[in-house]
């Protein structure tokens, strides 16, 4: 089906699971230089450490939060109304945009006036906005003029994760607070491969990174609901979640539900890859209810407009589609402008040919007309559209390898060089750019991808799908790709596109979305640790401390997926009393290494000696006991 026949705008409601509070967590905000810059975080409370000396306080830990207002109990969520337009004042006060009378794309107009769509249409009351004649409204344009926008300040506060406040709270937590702060912020030196990540992210640093093209802030002026975020090598590694219906599966309600589910678990951006009949309406519902940037592949919808016949695509249809989606508020477009006619023969000897949907569409068009791609030839005209709405480019890798066999071949790298050339064209227009990457790449070949991308694309952010490191595990490609994602994230990729267990097999459901998100949150965080991102180890250290102290609930809640952690624990130790037990089901009460170590520490404290001395003393006592019992290894019982 193309849209759920039961979906009606009048009865649409938020997924209850998306607004349920996470365990022992609360939404907190940090206010910037003006009261309407309120940056959201999730604060996880912890139990005190149970010690023989009366307990040690473990202050709440702040973590990055992508869930938007959905997890704020003070905000009433009604998806029929959409989210609050938090950037509205920022956009208006710049004075470089104007409200339109309504949609200006032909397709947008036709959908708005089609009475058959009334029952499912999102009832948007405000008209779209566009740059005034001659104006450029991109964050890169402001950055290059030396302007620090509220969006840039928002990003800076968000990236710092209230780390300094947390450390100050640790220092003030008790007599050993200073020692505790030192322990919890301890971090192994990283290898950043040239990334220059400051200890404190300032708004000026964000501005400079955006001006240089090393970072982007995807934030369409028609998506005022978005909470600004940055994608760049010198920021936290981000992840994207793909959703979208098809001609045979899912509908509007399910896709909005997937979006809210994805951001609950940590999706930094969401791509709507819908290919069904009601693409326009589905996208409107998603954008109006999304606090994270939304990306699309406009060629998919353009293809639907010509009944799936790639050879019938025209520049005029594609241009109208870009304007339609820009006026809805899409924050970044994947555009496969690097798929050029001369490159197509390079794929002839591949094992898996051209696997990108967008790439194959444009390859077919080029061959049908024996002409250069209109995306390539009209690229400057595309830039004019992008800068009028501040839509960022995600330059698509239409010739990415679809198997390890095809990795790092001539076609892939020819396209990459072209994407670098197009990046400089876009930057001439002050349009923000990131570069898409593979794909399927064996581990030993991954680093070359990152090095060549930095060289050819002038440090524009890299955004990769995995890469998958082996092709033998259908049903487990979230794992095969998570391995590659962690590696390429370490080498410098700015955003990782998740892969779900359903990759190559079918469209993901909610469970698949969550599995993909958690896998990629692990990969992104592992990359941050390996790069030596300041403060990246604090959460690891806090969880390790909770684990050693047998604070089971804190172990669950500090993790990426508290629900699953608690579920696994409860399968073998279900009683509440087991949440304070000093062992788990793996080793049991008598063989727990952490319990034994804790016993040594307690013994040392009671004897007034150091831990090493306590170990020696304990072993001497046991030796005497062994001799007294007859020096026999085994005894009759």
Swiss-Prot record:
Cofactor note: Binds 1 [4Fe-4S] cluster per subunit. The cluster is coordinated with 3 cysteines and an exchangeable S-adenosyl-L-methionine.
Protein's UniProt keywords contain Lyase: yes
A family per Pfam: ThiC_Rad_SAM
Residues binding substrate, per UniProt: 242, 271, 300, 336, 356-358, 397-400, 436, 463
Domain of life: Bacteria
GO biological process: thiamine biosynthetic process; thiamine diphosphate biosynthetic process
Pathway named in the protein's UniProt entry: Cofactor biosynthesis; thiamine diphosphate biosynthesis
Reactions accelerated catalytically: 5-amino-1-(5-phospho-beta-D-ribosyl)imidazole + S-adenosyl-L-methionine = 4-amino-2-methyl-5-(phosphooxymethyl)pyrimidine + CO + 5'-deoxyadenosine + formate + L-methionine + 3 H(+)
GO cellular component terms, semicolon-separated: cytosol
Record-listed E.C. numbers: 4.1.99.17
Cofactor field: [4Fe-4S] cluster
UniProt keyword annotations, A-Z: 4Fe-4S, Iron, Iron-sulfur, Lyase, Metal-binding, S-adenosyl-L-methionine, Thiamine biosynthesis, Zinc
Protein family: Belongs to the ThiC family.
PANTHER family in the record: PHOSPHOMETHYLPYRIMIDINE SYNTHASE, CHLOROPLASTIC (PTHR30557:SF1), THIAMINE BIOSYNTHESIS PROTEIN THIC (PTHR30557)
Quaternary data: Homodimer.
Protein purpose: Catalyzes the synthesis of the hydroxymethylpyrimidine phosphate (HMP-P) moiety of thiamine from aminoimidazole ribotide (AIR) in a radical S-adenosyl-L-methionine (SAM)-dependent reaction.
The protein's name: Phosphomethylpyrimidine synthase
Protein species of origin: Bordetella petrii (strain ATCC BAA-461 / DSM 12804 / CCUG 43448)
